Amino acid sequence: MRRTWRWVLGVLIAIVLVTALVLWLLLRGSLADLDGEHALPGLAKPVTIERDGLGVVTITAGSQADAMRALGRVHAQERYFEMDLMRRSAAGELSALFGPKAIDADKRMRVHRLRARTEANLQAALGDNGTAVRAYVDGVNEGLADLSVRPWAYLLLRQSPQPWQASDSVLTGLAMYADLQDPGNQTELALSRIRAVVPPALYALIAHDGTEWDAPLFGEPTGNAALPDASQLDLRTLKGKTGTEQEEGDVIGSNNFAVAGALTADGRAIVADDMHLGLRAPGLWFRVRLRYPD
């Protein structure tokens, strides 16, 4: 009896060890290759990719196209799943990865037809950057194909990553636009409902967008909102409650400030920005320094 239990225990231990080894090999194979020399088809000259102690990448190339091709490889090997999520979120294609749970999110974006509109106007969207974008796309697909194992997230989802396209690079930018804007148009819908039930002077105060501190790049600043006087708005005449408890929620907007050089000790201007973007893991920003001749 003891021999039987020992044999069963030994088999279980062996299964656990083999399973752990297979998982380790799969995860290890999906990691980016950070060392050595690699052939990257399409390069006109050799490119150097370096990382500092914090993992920040510096790419040194002989041309912009070569730098973008190398950047595409780096992005694919270290961030492809996140890139895939961004293009799919903009195009309304997340349910192809996650199933029915993502259908509602897809519906909110599909109404804009961003993939169809991007592909129909791709040349105009790329402008003079067509060569650089195509080099980047080739680098992305080469870097993805060069991974020993597809990124681990696809293993969990039992999916295969689809190749990158030039239109996907535009869609990732549109995904950030949707993150910073109101793709569901909820703000305008809410203002429309408010306008139907409040006096014009109160609506003008609520809907006013701007302050005396604004410095727009285009057009003139709108200034501060005008406070209605008693002849325009008498709160005592409003029906129903005049106040409600404010619900807690995400605060939309970013913190920015600029200080002129005339106000600093060494004469240099200061610009700071704290963008209120969604929290992601890994982070949205991927810092890279590109070095190539003008």
Which functions belong to the PLM regions below?
Residues L23-I270, M275-A281, P293:
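Substrate-recognition/specificity elements adjacent to catalytic centers across diverse enzyme folds
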Residues W285:
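Catalytic core of carbohydrate-active enzymes
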